[in-house]
Amino acid sequence: MVFSLKESSDSISKPSSLKNSTIIENPEILNNNNNNNNSNNIIKSPNFLLSQKQRSINISNEQTQRELNNNGGNLDHRDPNSPKYLTSSHSSVVIPQDNSNNNNNNNIRISTSPILTEISENGLLESPTSPIRTSSTPTTPTSPPFITSPPFITSPKGLNSPRRLVGFFSKSTSYQSLLANNNNNNNNSNNSNNNSNSSNSNISCSNNSNKISRLINNSNTTDSNASIRSSNNNNDDFDNNDDEDLNSINNSSGIGIGVSSDYSLMGSSSSINGNTTTTTTNTYSYNDNDNVNEYSPKGKRLIRHEKSKSSPPLSPITPYYENLVIKGNYTNSNNYNNYNNYYYNNNSSGNNNNNNNNNNNNNNNNNNNNNNNNNNNNNNNNISGNSGYNNSRDDLFKRPFEMNKESSPTNSLIPNVSALKLNRVIKSSNGSTIFTSTSSDIASENDNNKNNENENENENENENENENENDNDSDSENENENDNSIGNKSNKSNSELSIEEQEKKKEKDLENYINMINNSGFITNDSNNNNNNNNSGNNNSFISNGSPFSPIKEESPQPSPTFSPKPTLQRQRSNSKNVLYSPNASPSNSCKIPTPPLLHNISIIDTSNNNNNNSNNIENQNNNNNNIDNNIDNNIDSIDKKLKNNNNNNNNNNNNNNNNNNNNNNNNNNNNNNNNNNNNDDDDDDNNIKKTPNNKINTNENPMIITNSVLKRSGNIDYLQINNNYVIPSPSPGTQLSECTNQQMKYNPPVSIVDFTLIEKIGEGGFGQVFLAKKKDTGEIVAIKRMSKELIWSKNKVSHIKNERDILAQGKNHRWIVSLVYSFQDDQYLYLAMEYVPGGDLRSLLSALNSLDEDSARFYMAEMVEAVDSCHRLGYCHRDLKPENFLISRDGHVKLADFGLSKNVVTRYHLRSASADNTINTTTSTPTTSSNINQLSSSMIEHTPMKFGAAANGNGPLNSSVTDFGSFKDLSVAARLAYSVVGSPFYMAPEVLQATRGYGDEVDWWSLGCMFYEFIFGVPPFDGDSPEEVMETVLKWKTMLQRPDGVSDELWDLISGLINDGSTRLGSGEKGVENIKNHIFFNGVPWGKLHDLDPPFVPLLQGDYDTTYFENTEKLDNNFLLQQTQQLSLLPPPLPPPPQTPTQPQQPSLPPQTPNDKMIFDKIRSPVVYTNTHSGNIITSRSRPRNILGFTYPRADDQPLLWNNNNNNNNNNNNNNNNLLKNFEELTILNNNNNKNKNKGNSNNNNNNNNNNNNNNNNNNNNNNNNNNNNNSNNNKNNSNNKTVTIPISTGRLLNEIDNCNNNNNNDENNINTGNLTPPNSSPFNSGENLNFEKQEPTSPYGSYSKQQQ
């Protein structure tokens, strides 16, 4: 998928190696010599407007022609002696030669991008011999000569499709505010970074920066005394006089270049002296005396940067304010004061700290109304204060102007660690915790004086309306009136108060606030201090569902560019997803800090017991006279009792809570003969520490309902836990408790291609095509990758397809990897139904923009590092990293795809295991044997790659950071390295090309370094006209890799660290990816929270079926699927199943038991066939030779492999026994005559109820408890010789022929014994034997298919 601009073959040519690069030109100017007298020719593109104004640089064709003629020499870029030899691949703009004799101003307009903030810092456009010219007359703003419209864009095939790139050039205002805090440009575009409720919230100090015209020019220096409104002026001037300010700058500076306020201002040098701003501008001009040579260093830099600026930016990035404001210090202290007030509150100057006496008023009210026991107005109005921040030192985020450029390479907001310290938590006298944000929150409660007066009036009215008034009421009224008058007299504007007075005022208010809390009846245990008659017009301390909320009233914060005005625990993200915020965790760069969390705001109601006999009923709203802490204790006690006192008639009473007593786990069911005593539960300790109960997900018929909390699924944060008043996100979805544990597992029929409606073909590869499809029954929109079995088997790529299927199947647990939805097969094709990623890929983005600025590139680089690390953690080396394989999701984030060349390996990571038995010591010199490796659980291998200090066979230390195994789960084979020469030549590491010494996952980091280079400069570091030339250049990388100009030291250090020897490359070694994440270029990047950031580019989609960002799409007619079905019908029928005798039992015949308790596998009777080792020991079906066993997905949840056969055909009521058992290693088959279950655990099985409880991992699978008085009649058979045979799981599963049924789409021919589909309520043999599994099956099924070592 490539986007390019219109090309003129007669005027501009491109190097052969840059066929995907874009060139901007004006055909009208180049081809029409009669219309070149006008020096203000403007390129217009009416069909595709990117912005209203845009800078451009004029290059004279006459001057260019003279420079080319003076150069001489061989200009062939293929000639090594030519000066173009080393620069042809790094230039996408070739200055054309004009053979016209007309010397008029025939100009080439190259639309430039304002992404690069300081182009002139390295003298990139500086002419060494050009004299300095000073403009004497200013250019009128009515005719700016350099403002041009963007070029007209077409597809490579000439089809005009301006809509196709509309998403690439849309300004991502949310990311702009993230990097530069330019809030005034973001409030009109539904951006969640601006959470203010005020209509004036779009006013910020960044308007000043937008009005300072920072223009880059070469030889003209003009100092203008243009007066820029300083921050102590009225804010409305900045909001209404944008064009006036801009025009005044243009008129005074003598430059006819207009800069739109929508874009960042480029490279100015500005300083504020009092109220006057001096703007220094430089103007580049090219005249007849300029001697800039195309092949000189200056000319090369000019060409390179003209190329990088030839397309509009991703988003306007404002520059640093190092000259405008240095660490928030103005030369004028009054200006600094007013600027702080203006920036943080967005109110008129002098109305910020006028409401500081309200706390004193309420303090007096709370101290004089101690004997009123009404449950009316139970609220302390002014404890929490306002969440708006008036002092930048207390801000939870540092502003861009408060950071040095060295300390934060990005223009993003970073967390202020000092503002997150524990001194923000105030401890009362009885140990209660009250959250306060800053002293400024305490100081400012309301927006203006009128709000104070209205509230005080309402308080006096409410006080007079109280039913139980006494003498203290009148006293409190008088004191309120006095305090109100004092507050009105003491209200002063910020302009009249000095900094010292404000600090003293804040300290005093903080003392009053603390005294108010200590004297408040809500905090102390004194029964006489029940402040239930607080004079407030709003009663926010109410009781809902029996759970008292915090007495702290949370006011809506003042308009602030950073903080959300919503006083709940829920905040809004830019992608409109709800995320719970944890105050004890450092926020990410784009977090909006909500107000402090409510105390104990979770109420749990047990709907299973309608009759609540608890004397401490929390729903009684007449107990407001008691202390709030006592109410909380009662709430905890009542919840504990409700958790313990379940219905005695419940047939499935399985209480396995670790926080409850053992005795409470005993079910008091008289009809239940099976009491499950969990010996691993801990007793409750009675101590003075008050614990808040965790929210347990009860899966009984009457579950516990969580109320008073906003609980939505968002990302990997699904459930809410409360611990010490902190909202803590729950673990990842893979470790969460299933919500349908006691529900019957649904058996989904196998999926085939006829279940989908193919909509459009969106891609085509070497093995097949990719279609956009919709599932007919569920409406799921997926991308189906259809691959030909004939091609796969002929090219011996079966193992590659297996690896791709395994990685995609685990993608649901990794947000950086495209996840698999379905996988199935027929006789002709393999199908992978993946999630549809509609944003295209990074190659399309680079083709449209040609290059990225460092700030935008940093975002994509960080996400690419996370994606590659996720692949390595799964135990795979990608080996084919390129921009085409990084897809852009609908929310703008990156996902890694196309794992067709991935190699299943075990990378050198630290083994993070909680069990010491499963940990391999990598520091000792003793070799790790294969037997020790086999002791590792499959889940560790799958999700936590292992680290080896020696080869698996004990022959010595490894020569690489990756050990490759022939089968991903077969760890008993000897470790070896990868030797295949695969990948794209532009991004291929030298060790892959040599392929004699082997390589590991460090080759992926080399590929990332090459892509980072291409992000900045538009071309890969190693280029050539043919793959052979590219490979030769890669092998000579030490001499061919040169540092271009215009790249920062931090970025080049990162690139050179990745494009390096494998032994010293970043990402290799003991620390691995941590060395990359800790690099100075990624300072300030919130690793682990990148999805909270707003990406630079978000696709503009018109619907779920939008394929705008995919090229060469093809709509499918209605007969396409019918034709495919007819082709399948013409195939020869599958092989018939082997003959079966009628008297043959339906249970497998067990061979003699070996001394090692392992059964010799009968290959003659096997329904499967192993392929050779070169195909990865793939298992296929005998009946269908090209059917790959284990390919069908999903398997773990929806389509069971094995069933727990506790019930037989005569017992169909017990449907809870159909749960899939996972993570098993061995299979124990018990004969029919056995009425006891042999378990390694300590579970109690009474009255032959066949409760298969695995207690090895302290997990009680109590879903299989049959709570009735009827014993299983099938288990009451004759008790004769009990025989137990232990079979390896791979052999046992193959012997039972289960996978041959489930993994071949459950075809009738696959079931050898019956010829029919195995019913879900019984085992495939339906003979009544008891199958007990001790460990779970791995997510990747190939671990059980490893060839047995006999």
Curated annotation (Swiss-Prot):
> What are the protein's UniProt keywords?
ATP-binding, Kinase, Nucleotide-binding, Phosphoprotein, Serine/threonine-protein kinase, Transferase
Point to the regions of Pro residues compositional bias: 1131-1142
What Gene3D superfamilies does this protein's entry cite? Phosphorylase Kinase, domain 1 (3.30.200.20), Transferase(Phosphotransferase) domain 1 (1.10.510.10)
Catalysis performed (reactions)? L-seryl-[protein] + ATP = O-phospho-L-seryl-[protein] + ADP + H(+); L-threonyl-[protein] + ATP = O-phospho-L-threonyl-[protein] + ADP + H(+)
Against InterPro entries, the record matches this protein to: AGC-kinase_C, Kinase-like_dom_sf, Prot_kinase_dom, Protein_kinase_ATP_BS, Ser/Thr_kinase_AS, Ser_Thr_kinase_AGC
- Which terms in the GO cellular component ontology are assigned? microtubule organizing center
A molecular function (GO) held by this record is:
protein serine kinase activity
Q: Which residues form the active site?
A: 880 (proton acceptor)
Q: Its Enzyme Commission number? A: 2.7.11.1
Which protein family is it in? Belongs to the protein kinase superfamily. AGC Ser/Thr protein kinase family.
Q: Where is the composition biased (Low complexity)?
A: 127-140, 181-210, 223-235, 270-293, 337-391, 483-495, 525-551, 612-637, 645-679, 690-701, 1204-1219, 1232-1283, 1300-1313
Q: Name one Pfam family in it.
A: Pkinase
Q: Which segments show compositional bias classed as Acidic residues?
A: 236-246, 454-482
Q: List the disulfide bonds.
A: none
Domain of life per record: Eukaryota
Protein name per Swiss-Prot or TrEMBL? Probable serine/threonine-protein kinase DDB_G0278845
Domain AGC-kinase C-terminal, first and last residues per copy: 1083-1203
Polar residues composition-biased segments: 84-98, 211-222, 431-443, 565-592, 1314-1330, 1338-1350
* GO biological process per UniProt: intracellular signal transduction
Could you say which residues bind ATP here? 762-770, 785
EC category name? transferase
Positions of the UniProt region annotated as Disordered: 66-109, 121-159, 179-249, 270-296, 337-396, 431-506, 525-596, 612-701, 1129-1159, 1190-1219, 1232-1285, 1300-1350
- Residues annotated as domain Protein kinase: 756-1082
